[in-house]
């Protein structure tokens, strides 16, 4: 698994949502696995913070992970990003992509993309998910 955090995060939700889902929400081989698109967009668009969201991707060599395995990976990743927090304190929109081809196998590569509003839900305070470039 490769983890990549994207450098963007200052704009409105339209940018990352258009990328993840397509401008008309019709990106081929893209589907929402978890989270609420409208809620995440509302949190990002109403954010008073300079960096309104964090986004990135988990990319896999394997193309045949079960839905249960994907759910576990997403939950474990959230647990690492939000240590000590409960799931009612943050929101994550998870979008699966399968539009890139693995050149070695010829199969579609699995990517689990995430979009996180940088707002703590219960307090409205700024929330910056942990990742090494910002926190170490």
Give residue spans per PLM region.
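N-terminal nicking endonuclease/strand-transfer module with a His-rich metal-binding environment
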Residues: 1-136
């Amino acid at each position: 698994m490769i983890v990549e955090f994207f450098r963007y995060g200052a704009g409105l939700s339209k940018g990352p949502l258009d990328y993840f889902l397509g401008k008309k929400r019709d990106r081929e081989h893209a589907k929402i696995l978890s989270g609420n698109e409208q809620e995440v967009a509302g949190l990002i668009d109403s954010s008073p913070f300079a960096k309104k969201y964090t986004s990135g991707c988990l990319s896999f060599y394997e193309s045949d992970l079960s839905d249960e395995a994907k759910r576990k990976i997403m939950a474990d990743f959230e647990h690492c990003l939000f240590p000590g927090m409960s799931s009612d304190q943050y929101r994550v929109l998870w979008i699966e992509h399968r539009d890139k081809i693995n050149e070695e196998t010829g199969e579609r590569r699995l990517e689990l993309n995430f979009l996180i509003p940088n707002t703590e839900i219960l307090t409205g305070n700024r929330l910056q998910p942990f990742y090494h470039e910002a926190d170490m």
